[in-house]
Amino acid sequence: MSLTRLLIRDFRNIETADLALSPGFNFLVGANGSGKTSVLEAIYTLGHGRAFRSLQIGRVIRHEQEAFVLHGRLQGEERETAIGLTKDKQGDSKVRIDGTDGHKVAELAHLMPMQLITPEGFTLLNGGPKYRRAFLDWGCFHNEPGFFTAWSNLKRLLKQRNAALRQVTRYEQLRPWDKELIPLAEQISTWRAEYSGGIAADMADTCKQFLPEFSLTFSFQRGWEKETEYAEVLERNFERDRQLTYTAHGPHKADLRIRADGAPVEDTLSRGQLKLLMCALRLAQGEFLTRESGRRCLYLIDDFASELDDERRGLLASRLKATQSQVFVSAISAEHVIDMSDENSKMFTVEKGKITD
């Protein structure tokens, strides 16, 4: 699906905006602080229920307003879908799909698979394992219908188990939680392993095009020892977990380790190379989704020119065009994106929260 229309009200510094969008490239050009990133963030929030620059809702709602309102119109091959999200200062959300309330944010996420590329996105590579788990879980969410429910239940059970660890004295007292936890943990780990194995060739091929000077490898670590049953790990580590008051092993400790020429990428690659690798991984993930499901990602790229020379920008642009996906790009100057423009693209100028085309 592509987002053909976007309505924004009281989001960041944007009082109101009504944008007719291209199904191809959409460029947002303006000075720093003009509001161009806020447009990207509004789109992201419409598909995730939260912003990507701040988790504090008060910073996202426009000054002295009580709530933000976002509406979008999605065009698929066979039908159009109207979506909406309202969120107030108390954090209460209302999700509307095709005129009916009571929907979940996860439904919006399913309707709008998107990839976000920002200057802060290096955390995928040099941040903690949780960022790479999120990368894997995005793929599992869009490929496995039961993943979100299983993942939500896993989080709930781990929270309950960790609370119980502060009170129990014998492992047998934990068995009611572990009886439910173990099959969920194994299922989620299986899905992650299958996804990482399935996308490995796509990641390797795309990374080879972007970074031919390096040999990159990807290995999934499930969060506990290989060839060992999770039930055995939990029972064996009970005393240690009780001392720590949290569960030290499991799918919540999984990682996707990425190495360049045998060394961690964060120790080997420059900032420009890390950005290329991040872009390559996001592209590979979107292309894998399209091949597996026929659905296309929506790409959000903030500050397109940063860290990339002309050749690398051209390579990224050509790969994005080849996906036939909808792309939103912010830039300080139109000169940075003019080579990407064609007869189907749209150029928006953003100034002090006002958007014109």
UniProtKB/Swiss-Prot annotation:
UniProt keyword DNA repair, yes or no: yes
Gene this chain is encoded by: recF
Protein name stated in the entry: DNA replication and repair protein RecF
Pfam families linked: SMC_N (PF02463)
One Gene Ontology term from the biological process aspect of the record: SOS response
NCBIfam families from the UniProt entry: recf
Keywords annotated in UniProt: ATP-binding, Cytoplasm, DNA damage, DNA repair, DNA replication, DNA-binding, Nucleotide-binding, SOS response
Binding annotation for ATP: 30-37
Primary role: The RecF protein is involved in DNA metabolism; it is required for DNA replication and normal SOS inducibility. RecF binds preferentially to single-stranded, linear DNA. It also seems to bind ATP.
Annotated localization: Cytoplasm
Native organism: Escherichia coli O6:K15:H31 (strain 536 / UPEC)
